[in-house]
Amino acid sequence: MARYIGPKCKLSRREGTDLFLKSGVRALESKCNIEAAPGIHGQRRGRQSDYGTQLREKQKVRRIYGVLERQFRGYYQAAASKKGATGENLLQLLECRLDNVVYRMGFGSTRSESRQLVSHKAISVNGKTVNIPSYQVRPGDVVAVREKSLAQLRIVQALELCAQRGRVEWVDVDAAKKSGVFKNVPARSDLSADINENLIVELYSK
């Protein structure tokens, strides 16, 4: 399955919520009418079945983190094999992706831009260049913008946007040095309450 490269607003409208696919330079409401479904008329569908609700939740989370279906299923299988709640394990594995950590630290304005920074070798982990977006960052790892990319305007702008919206508590960032430490894996209570991971577990358990 190829990665989606179409309009980001269409995805947010499909799920009926902000998927944080846009940079936030302008208010989402000025660009996307997320209350309306995709299409010219944007009419909402009728009541969803239980399966439909579970599928939509899975698609929402998959699109938030920019993960393909095959990758997402792999994360679920890894989460199910670990101790603890499968749903929480799944979200933690997604949060530990390098492209997501780069986004959380504010080096990219979106996860998509952060993934591009990683792929273009603009990011290092513990002093070594890593160009794999799915690389699992561990507590204590130092994630930084490489010297050759420090002056990139999009990184400077992303840091400014992040300063406005605020950073998460599980990363410690030195914006001047464009470097940060991944302090710990976030607990479920630290993550979005708008995600119902139990629906995803129910979907894959069938």
Swiss-Prot record:
Recorded family membership: Belongs to the universal ribosomal protein uS4 family.
Species this protein is from: Pseudomonas putida (strain GB-1)
Pfam families with a match to the protein in the record: Ribosomal_S4, S4
The record, for InterPro entries, names: Ribosomal_uS4, Ribosomal_uS4_bac-type, Ribosomal_uS4_CS, Ribosomal_uS4_N, S4_RNA-bd, S4_RNA-bd_sf
Q: By its UniProt entry, which Gene3D superfamilies does this protein fall under?
A: Ribosomal Protein S4 Delta 41, Chain A, domain 1, RNA-binding S4 domain
Q: What keywords were assigned to this record?
A: Ribonucleoprotein, Ribosomal protein, RNA-binding, rRNA-binding
Report if keyword rRNA-binding is assigned.
Answer: yes
Q: What is this protein called?
A: Small ribosomal subunit protein uS4
List residues of the S4 RNA-binding domain.
96-160
What the entry lists under CDD domains is as follows:
S4
A Gene Ontology cellular component where this protein is annotated is: small ribosomal subunit
SMART domains attached to this UniProt entry:
Ribosomal_S4, S4
Membrane-spanning parts: none
Could you state one GO biological process linked to this protein? ribosomal small subunit biogenesis
